[in-house]
Amino acid sequence: MSITENESQEMLGRSELNDIEAILSITNTDVDAIQHIVKDNADAIFTWDYSLSRPALRKLYEKAKVGQWNATTDLPWETVVDEEKQVSMDQAALSSGLTANHYEGTVMDKWGDKEWTAFGIEQRRWSLSQFMHGEQGALICTAKIVETVPWYDAKLYASTQVVDEARHVEVFARYLDEKLGGSYQINAHLRMLLDDIVNDSRWDMTYLGMQIMVEGLALAAFGNMQQMTTEPLLKKLLRYVMSDEARHVAFGVLSLQEVYKDMSDLEIKERQEFAYEASVRMRDRFMSQEVWERMGVNPRDVVPLILRDPTREVFQQMLFAKIVPNCKKLGLLDRNDSWLRRRYEEMGVIQFENAEDTGEEYVKYELGETLADVQH
């Protein structure tokens, strides 16, 4: 059963999933702002129980301690990055399947190699900028988890993730500044999602929004770019970040599995709806409207074509390769008459449900392991 127009309006702010006008109406109006303030509405919790009663979290904590790396000394920052040459080599990945032939009859139909190369550079700059902003969101949310989670084991692990996230913001900011010559402001859809995650007072919603949804999509997106790029610094940077990121997603799976099994159907329905809203917002941000605007193209002319592009559709579906099996592991897909399963069927991403969940898979991402057996 599909959700009604009223339900969609209440959750997404629009009656139809692919309402282009509604998607594009959400823009970042304060592009010159340096700071953004969000109320976090949560209590800090001390615990006087210092027993380590969750072996899976203890194992994760130990792996985090030995898996640390130095962003300054462990990456080859001396690498010279030729933007135009790199874009030409990585064009398929950079344009995410968008080709000139697909835009026959539009302004892009007249684009030559120069314009498509410029688009590729801007697309990479935009993608890495959103990674950077998302990592700062993770930095803030994980610091919140340290404060709000009631378990000693979880506080210990979350503290290591705070350090990881600081390192991730550092490497993306440095790469954008030194190798790509600048960055983009945060996409409005991503900012709204981060605001909702920080604003919610319930500690498990911070986990769900950040560890499962944002970090889960990031892990898949990093894997896609790491697999496609031939640029050695970026390839190594992403590989190192992924080794941390997999632990972060596993942290969410291992923690929430314990919590959700005892929740009522009403409580689970709230989590299902939040997961769906987060999924749609993350999908919407990959329309790259800021890139099209910078290239002098009206996004309203191109977004309908993006939504119909089969190669773009495959790319966007792959971004959910981690989220869907993890939601299944948490029991979110099939509670309440399979409500979330039906939403993911409508989004065309349910095919990933039987992939290995990150709570089991994370060890395959450790530095020194090959990624050949990991599904991106």
What are these regions (language model features)?
Residues 174-246, 270-281:
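Active-site-proximal alpha-helical scaffolds that flank and shape metal-associated catalytic sites
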Residues 151-181:
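Carboxylate/His-rich catalytic cores and anion/metal-binding grooves
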Residues 139-145, 159-160, 219-225, 237-240, ...:
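A structural feature that tracks compact, well-ordered secondary-structure segments
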Residues 1-141, 147-155, 178, 182-185, ...:
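Terminal targeting/low-complexity segments that flank the catalytic cores of oxidoreductases
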Residues 129-132, 136, 159-162, 166, ...:
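Short amphipathic alpha-helical segments with heptad-repeat character
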Residues 134-141, 168, 214-221, 248:
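Amphipathic, well-ordered alpha-helical segments in soluble domains
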Residues 237, 249-259, 276:
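Helix-loop elements that line ligand-binding/catalytic pockets
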